[in-house]
């Protein structure tokens, strides 16, 4: 959850 926000990578849209 917060991990995705921490990583400045492109999320799976």
Curated annotation (Swiss-Prot):
The keyword Metal-binding does not apply. The keyword Secreted applies. GO terms for cellular component: extracellular region. It comes from the Eukaryota. The modification Valine amide is found at residue 13. It is found in: Secreted. Expressed by the skin dorsal glands. GO terms for biological process: defense response. Transmembrane segments: none annotated. Keywords: Amidation, Amphibian defense peptide, Secreted. Belongs to the frog skin active peptide (FSAP) family. Peroniin subfamily. This is Peroniin-1.2a. It comes from Litoria peronii (Emerald spotted tree frog).
